[in-house]
């Protein structure tokens, strides 16, 4: 457990630094659309899909090594880079199980409730500082 936490921490730090670097590098492209975050979400989703398929399809990783790879890259790096990638993988898993209605519901609830949470959190703090 200790080594896994260290791997998650290292990966998370690298992912967060990568997200910061990408958002800074793309900040001048558009002031209206957060291009950097959009790219992080898309790139993170691409990487998590590739990692999931790679870990499933190859015999290079046994269960123990796979746990370390997931901890460093998926939970750590991609968790620091974006959490949207995990959300996207969850949706893919639902679709692969033939649960399209549940996947659509999950998308709608996640996006709507997350947006509501952001709005509530924003206005709660704004109210404190009035």
From Swiss-Prot:
Fluoride-specific ion channel. Important for reducing fluoride concentration in the cell, thus reducing its toxicity. Keywords: Cell inner membrane, Cell membrane, Ion channel, Ion transport, Membrane, Metal-binding, Sodium, Transmembrane, Transmembrane helix, Transport. The chain crosses the membrane at residues 2-22, 35-55, 72-92, 107-127. InterPro entries: FluC. GO terms for cellular component: plasma membrane. GO terms for biological process: cellular detoxification of fluoride. It catalyses: fluoride(in) = fluoride(out). One of its GO terms (molecular function) is metal ion binding. This is Fluoride-specific ion channel FluC. It is found in: Cell inner membrane. Na(+) is not transported, but it plays an essential structural role and its presence is essential for fluoride channel function. Pfam families: CRCB (PF02537). Na(+) binds at residues 79, 82. Its main location: membrane.
């Amino acid at each position: 457990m200790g080594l896994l936490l260290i791997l998650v921490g290292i990966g998370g730090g690298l992912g967060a630094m990568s997200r910061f670097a990408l958002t800074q590098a793309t900040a001048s492209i558009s002031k209206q659309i957060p291009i950097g975050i959009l790219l992080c979400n898309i790139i993170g989703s691409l990487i998590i899909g590739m990692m999931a398929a790679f870990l499933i399809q190859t015999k290079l990783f046994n269960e123990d090594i796979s746990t370390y790879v997931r901890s460093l890259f998926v939970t750590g790096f991609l968790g620091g880079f974006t959490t949207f990638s995990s959300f996207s993988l969850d949706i893919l898993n639902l679709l692969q199980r033939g649960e399209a209605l549940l996947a659509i519901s999950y998308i709608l609830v996640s996006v709507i409730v997350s947006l509501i949470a952001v709005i509530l959190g924003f206005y709660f703090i704004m109210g404190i500082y009035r």
